[in-house]
């Protein structure tokens, strides 16, 4: 999906917050995230404030999925989401309803290359991992990106550009992530660097 519409976000915030000074502060925070090309969209998702704001923004969608579509198994992180169901035809029908709601209410568009209907046994790609009923593996692209970042951090440490503490924090972060998937071989590879 495209980035959040800042005007819509402020409108949603005003539904919950009556204090104009606080709204003014939030507008300044939101507008500070906008790109120079387009001041109407964008929140950097690594920012803690953004994580809260994207959840507020997407709450309308969560409620739509839960109460209007009556989806029983739905997961969302920021603007990535999955809907699980036993009925392929029903899922196909929901795509149009989801697309229309997102466009009408939140001015968001589904990315056409990121809509999949597949069996759970073939793996559900979500948040950098491919999830199976009994295990999960790191997506190949995620794995490559992770090792590139580790190599860059290691290079920076060897050249005195970062402290050993920073290197260790990165390694521990990746090792923690790998505990949640079949990453034993990758853990050994990282420990061998």
Identify the function of each model-found stretch.
Residues 1-78, 82-100, 105, 109-118, ...:
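Conserved polymerase palm-domain catalytic core
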Residues 39, 92-93, 110-193:
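Right-hand nucleic-acid polymerase module
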